[in-house]
UniProtKB/Swiss-Prot annotation:
Pfam families: Chromo, Chromo_shadow. It is found in: Nucleus. Residues 105-115 have a biased composition (Polar residues). Residues 24-82, 154-212 form the Chromo domain. Transmembrane segments: none annotated. This is Heterochromatin protein 1. Its main location: nucleus.
Amino acid sequence: MGKKTDNPETNNASSGAEEEEEEYAVEKILDRRVRKGKVEYYLKWKGYAETENTWEPEGNLDCQDLIQQYELSRKDEANAAASSSSSSSKKERPGSSTKVKETGRTSTTASNSSGSKRKSEEPAGPAGSKSKRVESEDTGDIVPAGGTGFDRGLEAEKILGASDNNGRLTFLIQFKGVDQAEMVPSTVANVKIPQMVIRFYEERLSWYSDNED
Protein backbone atom coordinates (compact mmCIF):
# COMPACT_ATOMS: atom_id res chain seq x y z
CA MET A 1 0.00 0.00 0.00
CA GLY A 2 1.24 3.48 -0.74
CA LYS A 3 0.31 6.25 1.58
CA LYS A 4 -0.40 9.63 0.12
CA THR A 5 -1.94 12.69 1.73
CA ASP A 6 -3.29 14.14 -1.49
CA ASN A 7 -5.02 12.42 -4.36
CA PRO A 8 -3.00 13.24 -7.52
CA GLU A 9 -4.56 16.22 -9.28
CA THR A 10 -8.11 15.19 -8.20
CA ASN A 11 -8.39 16.14 -4.56
CA ASN A 12 -9.27 19.83 -4.71
CA ALA A 13 -11.08 20.32 -1.41
CA SER A 14 -13.21 23.39 -0.87
CA SER A 15 -11.81 26.11 1.39
CA GLY A 16 -14.14 25.19 4.23
CA ALA A 17 -13.79 21.37 4.09
CA GLU A 18 -11.40 19.46 6.28
CA GLU A 19 -8.66 17.51 4.54
CA GLU A 20 -8.86 13.85 5.33
CA GLU A 21 -5.94 11.49 5.02
CA GLU A 22 -6.64 8.89 2.42
CA GLU A 23 -4.75 5.82 1.27
CA TYR A 24 -4.05 4.99 -2.34
CA ALA A 25 -2.62 1.74 -3.65
CA VAL A 26 0.50 1.93 -5.80
CA GLU A 27 0.10 -0.29 -8.84
CA LYS A 28 3.57 0.13 -10.33
CA ILE A 29 6.76 2.19 -10.06
CA LEU A 30 7.62 3.58 -13.47
CA ASP A 31 10.71 5.76 -12.90
CA ARG A 32 13.10 7.18 -10.34
CA ARG A 33 14.86 10.50 -9.85
CA VAL A 34 16.76 12.48 -7.23
CA ARG A 35 15.46 15.97 -6.62
CA LYS A 36 16.95 18.35 -4.07
CA GLY A 37 18.85 15.45 -2.54
CA LYS A 38 15.73 13.31 -2.08
CA VAL A 39 14.75 10.19 -4.00
CA GLU A 40 11.40 10.35 -5.77
CA TYR A 41 9.51 7.66 -7.67
CA TYR A 42 7.11 8.09 -10.56
CA LEU A 43 4.02 6.08 -9.62
CA LYS A 44 1.08 4.48 -11.41
CA TRP A 45 -1.85 4.47 -8.99
CA LYS A 46 -4.20 1.50 -8.91
CA GLY A 47 -7.60 2.46 -10.20
CA TYR A 48 -6.39 5.68 -11.81
CA ALA A 49 -5.52 6.50 -15.40
CA GLU A 50 -1.99 7.13 -16.68
CA THR A 51 -2.71 10.82 -16.65
CA GLU A 52 -2.94 10.64 -12.86
CA ASN A 53 0.64 9.34 -12.47
CA THR A 54 2.71 11.45 -10.06
CA TRP A 55 6.18 11.84 -8.59
CA GLU A 56 6.24 11.06 -4.87
CA PRO A 57 9.08 11.26 -2.30
CA GLU A 58 10.29 7.91 -1.02
CA GLY A 59 9.48 8.93 2.54
CA ASN A 60 5.78 9.24 1.70
CA LEU A 61 5.52 5.70 0.39
CA ASP A 62 4.64 2.48 2.18
CA CYS A 63 5.40 -0.03 -0.55
CA GLN A 64 8.91 -1.32 0.15
CA ASP A 65 8.32 -4.52 -1.82
CA LEU A 66 7.61 -2.57 -5.00
CA ILE A 67 10.57 -0.27 -4.36
CA GLN A 68 12.96 -3.23 -3.88
CA GLN A 69 11.59 -4.94 -6.97
CA TYR A 70 12.06 -1.77 -9.02
CA GLU A 71 15.61 -1.20 -7.75
CA LEU A 72 16.57 -4.81 -8.59
CA SER A 73 15.13 -4.33 -12.06
CA ARG A 74 17.18 -1.15 -12.52
CA LYS A 75 20.32 -2.96 -11.37
CA ASP A 76 19.75 -5.82 -13.83
CA GLU A 77 19.24 -3.36 -16.67
CA ALA A 78 22.43 -1.52 -15.77
CA ASN A 79 24.43 -4.78 -15.70
CA ALA A 80 22.98 -5.84 -19.05
CA ALA A 81 23.89 -2.48 -20.58
CA ALA A 82 27.44 -2.71 -19.21
CA SER A 83 27.82 -6.26 -20.55
CA SER A 84 26.57 -5.19 -23.98
CA SER A 85 29.00 -2.28 -24.04
CA SER A 86 31.89 -4.58 -23.08
CA SER A 87 30.99 -7.04 -25.86
CA SER A 88 30.90 -4.23 -28.41
CA SER A 89 34.35 -3.07 -27.31
CA LYS A 90 35.77 -6.58 -27.68
CA LYS A 91 34.36 -6.87 -31.19
CA GLU A 92 36.00 -3.60 -32.19
CA ARG A 93 39.42 -4.49 -30.78
CA PRO A 94 40.44 -7.06 -33.47
CA GLY A 95 39.83 -4.47 -36.18
CA SER A 96 41.94 -1.92 -34.33
CA SER A 97 44.66 -4.50 -33.76
CA THR A 98 44.68 -5.43 -37.43
CA LYS A 99 45.03 -1.79 -38.35
CA VAL A 100 48.01 -1.44 -36.04
CA LYS A 101 49.63 -4.52 -37.53
CA GLU A 102 49.10 -3.21 -41.04
CA THR A 103 50.59 0.10 -40.01
CA GLY A 104 53.55 -1.78 -38.58
CA ARG A 105 54.11 -3.62 -41.84
CA THR A 106 53.87 -0.40 -43.75
CA SER A 107 56.38 1.23 -41.44
CA THR A 108 58.74 -1.73 -41.80
CA THR A 109 58.47 -1.60 -45.58
CA ALA A 110 59.08 2.12 -45.57
CA SER A 111 62.05 1.62 -43.27
CA ASN A 112 63.52 -1.04 -45.55
CA SER A 113 63.04 1.20 -48.57
CA SER A 114 64.68 4.06 -46.72
CA GLY A 115 67.56 1.81 -45.74
CA SER A 116 68.05 0.70 -49.34
CA LYS A 117 67.99 4.29 -50.47
CA ARG A 118 70.57 5.30 -47.90
CA LYS A 119 72.84 2.45 -49.00
CA SER A 120 72.58 3.45 -52.65
CA GLU A 121 73.28 7.08 -51.81
CA GLU A 122 76.37 6.44 -49.68
CA PRO A 123 79.37 8.44 -50.89
CA ALA A 124 82.14 6.72 -52.74
CA GLY A 125 84.67 7.71 -50.05
CA PRO A 126 84.39 4.57 -47.89
CA ALA A 127 84.59 2.37 -50.97
CA GLY A 128 87.79 4.13 -51.94
CA SER A 129 89.23 3.55 -48.49
CA LYS A 130 88.30 -0.11 -48.71
CA SER A 131 90.12 -0.48 -52.03
CA LYS A 132 93.19 1.16 -50.48
CA ARG A 133 93.13 -1.38 -47.68
CA VAL A 134 92.94 -4.19 -50.20
CA GLU A 135 95.95 -2.83 -52.06
CA SER A 136 97.89 -2.62 -48.83
CA GLU A 137 96.92 -6.19 -48.00
CA ASP A 138 98.20 -7.24 -51.41
CA THR A 139 101.60 -5.90 -50.43
CA GLY A 140 101.44 -7.79 -47.15
CA ASP A 141 101.37 -4.65 -44.96
CA ILE A 142 98.94 -4.30 -42.06
CA VAL A 143 97.00 -1.03 -42.18
CA PRO A 144 94.73 0.25 -39.38
CA ALA A 145 91.01 -0.28 -40.02
CA GLY A 146 90.45 3.49 -40.13
CA GLY A 147 93.34 3.97 -42.55
CA THR A 148 96.57 5.82 -41.85
CA GLY A 149 96.93 9.48 -40.97
CA PHE A 150 97.67 10.10 -44.62
CA ASP A 151 94.24 8.65 -45.52
CA ARG A 152 92.69 11.14 -43.12
CA GLY A 153 94.49 14.04 -44.78
CA LEU A 154 96.98 14.60 -41.93
CA GLU A 155 100.49 15.92 -42.42
CA ALA A 156 103.42 13.94 -41.05
CA GLU A 157 105.57 15.85 -38.58
CA LYS A 158 108.31 13.38 -37.68
CA ILE A 159 109.31 9.73 -37.81
CA LEU A 160 109.85 8.65 -34.20
CA GLY A 161 111.04 5.13 -34.80
CA ALA A 162 110.80 1.94 -36.82
CA SER A 163 110.01 -1.68 -36.05
CA ASP A 164 110.00 -5.04 -37.74
CA ASN A 165 106.48 -6.47 -37.73
CA ASN A 166 106.71 -10.10 -38.86
CA GLY A 167 109.37 -9.22 -41.37
CA ARG A 168 107.61 -6.08 -42.56
CA LEU A 169 109.07 -2.68 -41.71
CA THR A 170 106.76 -0.08 -40.19
CA PHE A 171 107.45 3.49 -39.07
CA LEU A 172 106.11 5.16 -35.92
CA ILE A 173 105.03 8.54 -37.30
CA GLN A 174 103.87 11.61 -35.40
CA PHE A 175 101.23 13.56 -37.35
CA LYS A 176 100.61 17.28 -36.84
CA GLY A 177 97.65 18.10 -34.62
CA VAL A 178 97.45 14.55 -33.24
CA ASP A 179 98.70 13.59 -29.78
CA GLN A 180 99.26 9.90 -30.41
CA ALA A 181 101.73 8.61 -33.00
CA GLU A 182 100.72 5.68 -35.18
CA MET A 183 102.38 2.84 -37.04
CA VAL A 184 102.50 3.24 -40.83
CA PRO A 185 103.81 0.62 -43.27
CA SER A 186 107.11 1.58 -44.86
CA THR A 187 105.59 1.05 -48.31
CA VAL A 188 103.15 3.88 -47.57
CA ALA A 189 105.71 6.16 -45.93
CA ASN A 190 108.15 5.73 -48.82
CA VAL A 191 105.51 7.12 -51.17
CA LYS A 192 104.02 9.83 -48.96
CA ILE A 193 107.14 11.18 -47.23
CA PRO A 194 110.23 9.88 -49.06
CA GLN A 195 112.53 12.73 -47.92
CA MET A 196 111.55 12.24 -44.26
CA VAL A 197 112.27 8.51 -44.57
CA ILE A 198 115.72 9.25 -46.04
CA ARG A 199 116.53 11.69 -43.21
CA PHE A 200 115.43 9.09 -40.68
CA TYR A 201 117.86 6.57 -42.15
CA GLU A 202 120.71 9.10 -42.40
CA GLU A 203 120.36 10.07 -38.74
CA ARG A 204 120.83 6.47 -37.72
CA LEU A 205 123.57 5.38 -40.14
CA SER A 206 127.09 4.90 -38.84
CA TRP A 207 129.79 5.87 -41.30
CA TYR A 208 133.06 4.02 -41.20
CA SER A 209 136.36 5.26 -42.61
CA ASP A 210 138.16 3.09 -45.14
CA ASN A 211 141.24 3.27 -42.93
CA GLU A 212 139.51 1.67 -39.95
CA ASP A 213 140.15 -1.97 -39.30
